[in-house]
Amino acid sequence: MPIQVVSADFDKTATRPEEWPRGATPEIAFVGRSNVGKSSMLNALARRKGLARVSSTPGRTRALQFFDLSYRPTPAARPRAIRFCDLPGYGYAKVSRAERDRWTAMIEDYLRDRDVLRAVVLIVDARHAPSESDEDAAAFLVSAGRRLVVAATKTDKLPKARRVLALQQVERALGLARGDAVPFSAVEGTGTDALWARLAALAAEEARTAEADPPA
């Protein structure tokens, strides 16, 4: 049954750890190359057009963008809180080396140190094999001990006969098991429910673990 989104709102922009939102709300981060479709994916998941600004200009997002959502996993369930974080896209060349280094440090600090971060969605373009930057991002997330969910976006731009092969190419390149990558298209509306189901399960799993094994 599809997740019901109760509310979705922009929270804040942050460039330093002291600006990150406080509280214990489980967080999901979204990362990928510039112009891979992160904003479109966020809007589709939120069931709200315009929540995350979609731009045709790569590299527009230059800070961490936080969004607060509440959802019901089933119609009878009480609303649960979750927060999404949109990270600046990597692989954008038209900025100075110093600016790229600043972005990299900001993103890596967040991915290593954010204690409420439950999973990271790595977004890749289904039309192409994962880039070296995509592979590096996946390796970094694994080394940082983060739960990784891979979403292959823009599947609407592929003939249906090629979609399965495209997903298998992504899974092989990133060392995933068959069926691990989530096919996604904001245009067709496909993949939204499957991705939501994974993210909600990860958030709930972490919450149950914390309740069963509280810190000393």
Swiss-Prot record:
KW Cell division (keyword) present: yes
Gene Ontology cellular component list = cytosol
**Binding site residues for Mg(2+):** S39, T61
Q: Where does GTP bind?
A: 32-39, 59-63, 86-89, 153-156, 184-186
Enumerate the InterPro entries for this protein: G_ENGB_dom, GTP-bd, GTP-bd_ribosome_bio_YsxC, P-loop_NTPase
**Which residue ranges does the record assign to the EngB-type G domain?**
24-205
A biological process from GO: division septum assembly
Record bears the keyword Acyltransferase: no
Q: Which cofactor does it need?
A: Mg(2+)
| Keywords for the protein's UniProt record, in alphabetical order | Cell cycle, Cell division, GTP-binding, Magnesium, Metal-binding, Nucleotide-binding, Septation
Q: One GO MF term, please? A: metal ion binding
What family, per the record? Belongs to the TRAFAC class TrmE-Era-EngA-EngB-Septin-like GTPase superfamily. EngB GTPase family.
* Functional note: Necessary for normal cell division and for the maintenance of normal septation.
Tell me the protein's name. Probable GTP-binding protein EngB
